[in-house]
UniProtKB/Swiss-Prot annotation:
Pathway named in the protein's UniProt entry: Metabolic intermediate biosynthesis; chorismate biosynthesis; chorismate from D-erythrose 4-phosphate and phosphoenolpyruvate: step 1/7
Modifications made to the protein after synthesis: The N-terminus is blocked.
Gene Ontology biological-process entries: amino acid biosynthetic process; aromatic amino acid family biosynthetic process; chorismate biosynthetic process
Family note: Belongs to the class-II DAHP synthase family.
Highest taxon in the source lineage: Bacteria
Summary of subunit composition and partner proteins: Homodimer.
Identification of the protein by name: Phospho-2-dehydro-3-deoxyheptonate aldolase
């Protein structure tokens, strides 16, 4: 299970890279 913050961090990194 992932934490909401963890998911947000992944999304942030995704948008930062792209």
């Amino acid at each position: 299970t992932r934490r909401f913050d963890d998911v947000l961090d992944e999304v942030k990194g995704f948008f930062e890279v792209h």
